Curated annotation (Swiss-Prot):
One of its GO terms (molecular function) is quinone binding. It comes from the Bacteria. It is found in: Cellular thylakoid membrane. This is NAD(P)H-quinone oxidoreductase subunit M. One of its GO terms (cellular component) is plasma membrane-derived thylakoid membrane. The gene is ndhM. Keywords: Membrane, NAD, NADP, Plastoquinone, Quinone, Thylakoid, Translocase, Transport.
Length: 118
């Protein structure tokens, strides 16, 4: 049975991709990061998300893969992405289809605010 967890920037499926289709799997999790391209990603930042995903999956090792556990992993990854944005590791993609600033308004340094919001 296909389980999924969908947040704004993370989609997790208990499935593998075959011929561009999701095929349910009891052994494979498929991760889709930022499907709407809301952020600008460097390879390092994307790898941080993948490592965090691996760490979270490992933390559930030996437990049943339930809808609840999958949603917790997705939620934890969503919070991790927020932390990357706050640290400046990623930024909003101003060429995105929709600019909704779902993780908060961008912070732009000015001489008056320099260093105050770190």
């Amino acid at each position: 049975m296909l389980l999924k967890s969908t947040t704004r920037h993370i989609r997790l499926y208990t499935a593998e991709i075959k011929n561009s289709e999701l095929v349910p799997s009891d052994n494979v999790l498929t991760l889709d990061v930022d499907p709407d391209n809301e952020f600008n990603w460097g390879e390092d930042s994307l790898q941080k998300v993948y490592r965090k995903f691996d760490e979270l999956v490992e933390s559930y090792s030996g437990q049943d893969l339930t809808d609840y556990n999958l949603r917790r992993i997705g939620s934890d990854l969503e919070h991790f992405i927020r932390s990357l944005l706050q640290k400046g590791d990623i930024s909003y993609n101003l060429q995105s289809r929709v600019l909704n600033y779902s993780m908060g308004l961008p912070k732009v340094e000015s001489p008056e605010t320099e260093g105050k919001y770190r």
